[in-house]
């Protein structure tokens, strides 16, 4: 999908803002961005989830990757970044743009993009801080496979409104897990 010029400019400004800021700060501001993302996802609902019960599917969310206790901070942040990146990719497809209100979708893109930039700055800083920044490739691969299952499901369901509703609810659930991981990381600081 070709992003509108105004949205592209907003993303460039956000990119410059987070690139120029110093340090990793998974602050209350970042938590507020997460809540706004979840609120936007809730507002994007177009049909009742109850009308789509027959389409429910277990996408096998890799919850163990979001437990956060076994990770170094850089590893956990890398997993969070991958989650945001894959969510952005999923919702920026041509089939996705047809399923959602364009204004809400653009706001959603901006929130996700800001979070990705914030997390990227944190990864860069944390890799320099930790002695052995072993990036947990298995965890990142688990997140990618999770999104591959979601994409395959949408294709099998021919991107139906109910399939998108099931996916929207699933992404809200996964974003809630990522929000909880971020809270645990902030408490460690």
Curated annotation (Swiss-Prot):
- Show the CDD domains listed in the entry: IFab
Residue span of the signal peptide, if any?
1-23
Please indicate if the UniProt record lists Transcription regulation as a keyword. Answer: no
Q: Which residues are glycosylated?
A: 95
Q: Which cysteines are joined by disulfide bonds?
A: 24-122, 52-162
Q: What keywords were assigned to this record?
A: Antiviral defense, Cytokine, Disulfide bond, Glycoprotein, Secreted, Signal
**InterPro entries recorded:** 4_helix_cytokine-like_core, Interferon_alpha/beta/delta
What is a GO molecular function of this protein?
A: cytokine receptor binding
Q: Cross-referenced Pfam families, in alphabetical order?
A: Interferon
> For this chain's UniProt record, which GO biological process terms are given?
adaptive immune response; B cell activation involved in immune response; cellular response to virus; defense response to virus; humoral immune response; natural killer cell activation involved in immune response; response to exogenous dsRNA; T cell activation involved in immune response
Q: Cellular location of this protein?
A: Secreted
Work out whether the entry's keyword set contains Signal: yes
Kindly list the GO CC terms recorded for this protein.
extracellular region; extracellular space
Q: Which family does it belong to?
A: Belongs to the alpha/beta interferon family.
According to its UniProt entry, what is the function of this protein?
Answer: Produced by macrophages, IFN-alpha have antiviral activities. Interferon stimulates the production of two enzymes: a protein kinase and an oligoadenylate synthetase.
Please state what the protein is called. Interferon alpha-14
> Upper taxonomic classification of the species?
Eukaryota, Metazoa, Chordata, Craniata, Vertebrata
């Amino acid at each position: 999908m070709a992003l509108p010029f105004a949205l592209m400019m907003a993303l460039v400004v956000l990119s410059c803002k987070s690139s120029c800021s110093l340090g990793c700060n998974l602050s209350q501001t970042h938590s507020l961005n997460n809540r706004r993302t979840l609120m936007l996802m809730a507002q994007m609902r177009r049909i009742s989830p109850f009308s789509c019960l027959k389409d429910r599917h277990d996408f096998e969310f890799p919850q163990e990757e979001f437990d956060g206790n076994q990770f170094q901070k850089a590893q956990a942040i890398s997993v969070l970044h991958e989650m945001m990146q894959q969510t952005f990719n999923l919702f920026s497809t041509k089939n996705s743009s047809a399923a959602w209100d364009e204004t809400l979708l653009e706001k959603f893109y901006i929130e996700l993009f800001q979070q990705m930039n914030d997390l990227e700055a944190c990864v860069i800083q944390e890799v320099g801080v930790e002695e052995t920044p072993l990036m947990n490739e298995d965890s990142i691969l688990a997140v990618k496979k999770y999104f591959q299952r979601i994409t395959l499901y949408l294709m099998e369901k021919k991107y139906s409104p109910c399939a998108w509703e099931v996916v929207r609810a699933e992404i809200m659930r996964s974003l809630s897990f990522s929000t909880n991981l971020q809270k645990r990381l902030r408490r460690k600081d």
